[in-house]
Structures are given as structure tokens and as C-alpha cells.
């Protein structure tokens, strides 16, 4: 893909989608943006509102407009955030029926447009919804990316940094599996500037109870935010920007995205959060870590949970 004059189409011009767009515009990752939404007026309004940044933001763009699925045909990346938001107290998996139907319709229209680029999806429950999209479109699985556990991992890094009083960007810590309640913190691979996180347990700077609490707080963070302000969107918007930028710039960055497993980590036939190399061809390779027995068991259980949910929407594809 070209590094300039890239075109990004956003499907779903709500809070998550527009948070992504605002972050993307500020970082200058593309030159052309198109918004598609089931309700044309908000899409048009957001396009006009964001157009006002043209004369203000240094990393600017050439055009932004409300459009239709026909605009997907020559897009480099399609980002999908459409779907109803999570309600207070509701798990992501409980959203599956309605959002899977929405995604089937979107997938049909995107395929019909002749789109041949990379799709990045954040609609919840993202692992299942990404699976539905790939099955309905029949697109190369490598060219369909879920946001996976990028946000979960960012939350984990922030909480570890907060506990140890270090900058989150100095923390390398990862969450794998479902973007949801069954997610797994992979402590065996976590480190701070190269020093394993478990060394901090050995020296007394952290306890195993601290790690358990940090993982629990990571899982509960979305519920906390939703209870306070009814939705999460800035964090996931930033994560989507990071993924799309890695695609458009062919960065070969390793991110915790939703990629399709075909035997990796002893699981297959589903999308879930794993470390994968992201470049212009989508997720290009899954990185396989040596998980501990406990981590593998938890990961298997997370995949089993997702498979059960996928089974409930198989009639759609």
C-alpha cells in the first residue's frame, strides 16, 4: 500500500468510530476518510465537524465526507465499529445476536462493493463478530483483523505501571483470548524494560495477589467506565488508530489483535486476541509464546467460551 493518499472508510459513525477518526486525523495516518452510517445525518454532521480541523491540525488530511458502501471499492482500509453499545451490567457476549445480524448485513454490502483491502473490526463481541464478517465475506482471513485484546493489554500495562510507579510505555504486558470476561493475562511474557514481571514478585515489589487484582481490574475496567459514562470509546479509538497505522505504514508491528487461529496455541476455527505481526497484508503471522500450563488452560477455556457463542450465530453464515 502507498504511504500517502491512503483512503480509510469508517462504518459506524458513533462514539467509537468518531473517536478513532479524531485520533487518526491528529496522527495524520491517511489523506481521505469516508463515514458510512445507518443514520446518514450524524455521518454528515461528523464529517462537517471534523472538516473544521483541516486548518488547525498540523498532521492534516485532504478530504472527509459522508458516503456509501460504494466508497469501499477503492479503500485501503475499512474500519467497522457499527453495532449497538454495551449496556451497564451486560457482558459483551450477551450482545451477540443483534450485532451479528448487523455485521452480516455490513459484510454483504462491503463484499458487494468490490473491496479488496484490509478490514479492522471493533464491534462487540469483537472476536465473534470478526468471525461472522470473515465467514460472510469469504475474505482472506489475514486481511480481516479484530481489535482483539489491544485495549485489554493497554489497560493491563497502565495498571502495572500505576502499581510500580513507572510509565505504562515501559511495561510490556499482554492479555490474550476473548476481549471480555474470560481474557487471560500472560504474566509469563510480561516485563518492564526487559526485566520479567515475576522478578518483581521475587524481590517483594509485587505479590501474586497484586497480579490477580490487576487482572481483575483489567477485566472490570469496561464495566466501571460504562457505569460511569455509559460507553467506552477513547481507548478503543486509540487502539484502532494504532492497528490501522501499522497496516498503512507496513510497520510489521506486533500487536495483540484478533487473528484467526488454525492450530496456533492449540486452538482453531476462531478469531481471538493473540500477538500477531501487522503490516500491509493484514495480520501476517501469529507469534506463538510458550505459555505456562495454567495460562494455556485459561486460554483454552476462553476459546471454548467463544466457540459456544459462535455456534449460536452459525445460521448467519
From Swiss-Prot:
Phosphotyrosine: modified positions: 223
Chemical reaction(s) catalysed: (S)-lactate + NAD(+) = pyruvate + NADH + H(+)
Binding-site list for substrate: 86, 92, 124-127, 152-155, 232
Molecular function terms from GO: L-lactate dehydrogenase activity
Compartment(s) where it occurs, according to its Swiss-Prot or TrEMBL record: Cytoplasm
One CC-aspect GO term: cytoplasm
Pathway the protein contributes to: Fermentation; pyruvate fermentation to lactate; (S)-lactate from pyruvate: step 1/1
PROSITE patterns (UniProt xref): L_LDH
Pfam families per UniProt: Ldh_1_C, Ldh_1_N
Active site per UniProt: 179 (proton acceptor)
Job of this protein: Catalyzes the conversion of lactate to pyruvate.
HAMAP family named among the record's database cross-references: Lactate_dehydrog
Quaternary structure, from the entry: Homotetramer.
PANTHER family per the UniProt record, alphabetical: L-2-HYDROXYCARBOXYLATE DEHYDROGENASE (NAD(P)(+)), L-LACTATE DEHYDROGENASE
Name of this protein: L-lactate dehydrogenase
Amino acid at each position: 500500500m502507498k504511504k500517502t493518499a491512503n483512503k480509510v472508510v469508517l462504518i459506524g459513525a458513533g462514539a467509537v468510530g468518531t473517536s478513532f477518526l479524531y485520533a487518526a486525523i491528529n496522527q495524520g495516518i491517511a489523506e481521505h476518510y469516508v463515514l458510512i452510517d445507518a443514520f446518514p445525518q450524524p455521518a454528515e454532521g461528523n464529517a462537517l465537524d471534523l472538516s473544521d480541523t483541516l486548518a488547525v491540525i498540523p498532521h492534516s488530511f485532504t478530504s472527509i465526507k459522508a458516503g456509501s458502501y460504494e466508497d469501499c471499492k477503492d479503500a485501503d482500509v475499512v474500519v467497522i465499529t457499527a453495532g449497538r453499545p454495551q449496556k451497564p451490567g451486560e457482558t459483551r457476549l450477551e450482545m451477540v445476536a443483534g450485532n451479528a445480524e448487523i455485521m452480516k448485513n455490513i459484510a454483504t454490502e462491503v463484499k458487494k462493493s468490490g473491496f479488496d483491502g484490509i478490514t479492522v473490526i471493533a464491534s462487540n463481541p469483537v472476536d465473534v463478530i470478526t468471525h461472522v464478517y470473515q465467514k460472510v465475506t469469504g475474505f482472506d482471513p489475514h486481511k480481516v483483523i479484530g481489535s482483539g485484546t489491544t485495549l485489554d493489554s493497554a489497560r493491563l500495562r497502565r495498571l502495572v505501571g500505576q502499581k510500580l510507579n513507572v510509565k505504562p510505555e515501559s511495561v510490556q504486558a499482554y492479555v490474550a483470548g476473548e476481549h471480555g470476561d474470560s481474557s487471560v493475562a500472560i504474566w509469563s511474557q510480561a516485563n518492564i524494560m526487559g526485566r520479567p514481571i515475576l522478578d518483581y514478585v521475587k524481590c517483594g515489589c509485587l505479590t501474586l495477589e497484586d497480579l490477580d487484582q490487576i487482572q481483575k481490574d483489567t477485566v472490570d475496567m469496561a464495566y466501571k467506565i460504562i457505569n460511569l459514562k455509559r460507553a467506552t470509546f477513547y481507548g478503543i479509538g486509540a487502539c484502532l488508530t494504532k492497528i490501522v497505522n501499522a497496516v498503512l505504514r507496513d510497520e510489521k508491528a506486533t500487536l495483540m489483535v484478533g487473528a484467526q487461529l488454525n492450530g496456533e496455541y492449540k486452538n482453531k476455527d476462531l478469531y481471538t486476541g493473540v500477538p500477531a505481526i501487522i503490516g500491509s497484508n493484514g495480520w501476517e503471522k501469529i507469534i506463538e509464546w510458550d505459555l505456562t500450563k495454567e495460562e494455556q488452560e485459561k486460554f483454552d477455556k476462553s476459546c471454548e467460551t467463544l466457540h459456544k457463542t459462535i455456534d449460536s450465530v452459525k445460521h448467519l453464515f
